[in-house]
Amino acid sequence: MSTNKEIITDDFCFKVYDVLNSEHLNIKDILKKFKDTSEICSNLDDFIANNLIRNKDDGISNTYVIYYMNNPIGILFTNFHPVEEIDGKMLPDEIEICLGIIPRYQNKHLGQTLEREISIKLLEMYPTISFIVASIKDENIRSKKAAFNAGYTYFEGNQYHFNRR
């Protein structure tokens, strides 16, 4: 079951980020100290605040704390991108995801399971969306491998798509 405050998949619970929740603040602070935080975004605090505001406009963009076995393990961002034209191509509505898992839970194959489960769930929740996008830098081999194992395919540039089946 999923609500506006949380999304539940087989293995994970995604709770909407609460700026007053000390557990949520702690996960954010751990990620900010982690050297690969720039993979998530350069200014985590601003990104979280802006994403929570965007949710009021589109109802899809949001920031979530990821829970696995009742333990907070990271942060997920969902960003809605409406139909747009880029370089002469019309791109349909899409949801882009970005996630960061704290070091303690990395290298346990949670990333690929998490990406697969949240992508399937988002496509169930939003039937007009055809695919989920993950943007992964070329040098981030672990994340690219996790995305492929989760069912993503390479699209172009640094974009990988999880298509509706």
Residues of each region from the PLM?
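A short, internal acetyl-CoA/4′-phosphopantetheine-binding micro-motif in the GNAT/acyltransferase core
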Residues: 96-108, 136-137
